[in-house]
Amino acid sequence: RERVRQPWYPVQEQYGLPLLYHRDIYDLPRNLAYEKIRPVIKGIIAENPQLDMVIDLHRDGVRREITTTTFPEGDVGKVLIVIGTRHPGWESNLALALCLNRELETVAPGISRGIRQYNEIYNQDLHAHSILIEIGGHENTLEEVLRTVPYLAEALARTYYRFFEQNE
């Protein structure tokens, strides 16, 4: 788990953004994952009211051909942003997702799979700026997913400064 967490340190060090990283996994059984994590997210938000964004990281369950692209350093997992629309206020999550998607394509053209909207909640009703990010898929190697993180970290930092400056 530290190996997955470590690439996120530049978000704090290089970009000056504080990062709260919750590393527990709640995906078994899969059909109860969001229900199981919901009280944890509520608690984190209650204990940290200064949080500007909540990001839920996953790997997608689709084929490698869809989730992979090649950059100079090798294959990387592509990024998909998922927004749930079955709750009031989902539009603020979509606004954040649109900004992040633009920054991803600026930082690393071709790395984004875009934004998908589903009639779900994904616990995104718990915070006004909450998004689900799929990095690669179940057929991608850990190394491919880790190669994505610096690009995503830069895009998230750029998104943070652009989105919250323009919405203040």
Language-model segments: which ranges?
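A short, glycine/acidic-enriched catalytic loop
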Residues: 62-89, 97
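Solvent-exposed loop/turn segments at secondary-structure junctions
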Residues: 25-29, 59-64, 86-89, 120-123, ...
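Stable alpha-helical elements in mature extracytoplasmic
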Residues: 4, 8, 37-41, 93-96, ...
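Active-site-adjacent substrate-binding region
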Residues: 89-116
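Soluble non-cytosolic domains of exported or imported proteins
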Residues: 2-3, 31-35, 87-95, 139-147
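Catalytic-core regions of hydrolytic enzymes
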Residues: 1-66
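Envelope-exposed proteins and targeting segments
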Residues: 15-18, 51-53, 75-79, 127-131
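Active-site-adjacent mobile loop/cap segments within catalytic or ligand-binding domains
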Residues: 114-168
